[in-house]
Amino acid sequence: MRAPRRRCYRVRPMHDVSKLEKRLLRAAANAIRDFELIGDGDRIMVAVSGGKDSYTLLHVLMRLRERAPIDFDLVAVNLDQGQPGYPAEIVERHFQAVGVPHRMLYADTYSIVRRLVPEGKTTCPVCSRLRRGVLYNAAAEMGCTKIALGHHRDDLVETLLLSALYSGALKSMPPKLRSDDGRNVVVRPLCYAAEEDIAAFATAMRFPIVPCDLCGSQPNLRRKRVKALLAELSDEHPAVKGNLLNALGHVVPSHLLDRDLHRLVASTGRDPWLDGDEDEDGGCLQGEVADALVKLAGAREDA
């Protein structure tokens, strides 16, 4: 597999920046509408690490708030995890410059990660879990109803392939998820947005990007390989990532091998192969069969 092409995101003319912004605003607005990510009266914690994704997320939500037909509040939060040389002041200055209510947090998870993760292994999974725990506690303390994260389309499709190829499961990052402790709801308003658009926009806006490798962690080699595979496929067929994202929203359960699902479908007294709820072209289940899917999802959440 050849290495993906390196993309250079040059500063664009203002009319191009405006087009990028409109595309990102439209993607976020569609996701918010489709999955009811934000409601009237919500207080949203926007987790900002200092990377291109979270800066763009903050910008997009601030712009949407200006024109939204509902009333919601934003509070930007940055977490310094004790990584050597982490420049939290850069992020705080950005918060002050854009005039967003904000809070700076500190929790030395870095030393915990170093103790738990063997030398040479990627620290990202453990670091991410510890970071989520700190943010969850802070959100509850601050009275936030939602936590907004900056994951985008490419994150979702990469995770889909990682789960299928390395874990044997069809799943990805959901646009909306209640945390295991039941106290917090995580939302991903950029789930429809392309990483390429986000990177180009962040460059054009000259966001003060904080390096993501200050901890010295090894890269996640599996994710890196999947990203390279997607880049190679996209060179041949540019719609690949969009098609994979669409696949997450066009599931044909009767054409899968989930035995629990098939037992629930059978309990409706209808056979999707014989009763016309499915076709070989990928039509979606309707009526009672769709109700079975809802029951299955609820049963799995309770398990």
Curated annotation (Swiss-Prot):
Subunit structure: Homodimer.
Other remarks on this protein: The thiolation reaction likely consists of two steps: a first activation step by ATP to form an adenylated intermediate of the target base of tRNA, and a second nucleophilic substitution step of the sulfur (S) atom supplied by the hydrosulfide attached to the Fe-S cluster.
Co-factor binding details: Binds 1 [4Fe-4S] cluster per subunit. The cluster is chelated by three Cys residues, the fourth Fe has a free coordination site that may bind a sulfur atom transferred from the persulfide of IscS.
Name of the protein in question: tRNA-cytidine(32) 2-sulfurtransferase
Gene: ttcA
Names of required cofactors: Mg(2+); [4Fe-4S] cluster
Enzyme class: transferase
Keyword Metal-binding: yes
Role description: Catalyzes the ATP-dependent 2-thiolation of cytidine in position 32 of tRNA, to form 2-thiocytidine (s(2)C32). The sulfur atoms are provided by the cysteine/cysteine desulfurase (IscS) system.
Residues annotated for [4Fe-4S] cluster binding in this entry: 124, 127, 215
GO terms of molecular function: 4 iron, 4 sulfur cluster binding; ATP binding; metal ion binding; transferase activity; tRNA binding
Reactions catalysed: cytidine(32) in tRNA + S-sulfanyl-L-cysteinyl-[cysteine desulfurase] + AH2 + ATP = 2-thiocytidine(32) in tRNA + L-cysteinyl-[cysteine desulfurase] + A + AMP + diphosphate + H(+)
Assigned keywords, A-Z: 4Fe-4S, ATP-binding, Cytoplasm, Iron, Iron-sulfur, Magnesium, Metal-binding, Nucleotide-binding, RNA-binding, Transferase, tRNA processing, tRNA-binding
Domain of life: Bacteria
Species annotation: Anaeromyxobacter sp. (strain Fw109-5)
Entry EC number(s): 2.8.1.-
GO biological process terms, semicolon-separated: tRNA modification
Family named by the database record: Belongs to the TtcA family.
Residue ranges of the motif PP-loop motif: 49-54
Annotated pathway: tRNA modification
GO-annotated cellular components: cytoplasm
Protein's cellular compartments: Cytoplasm
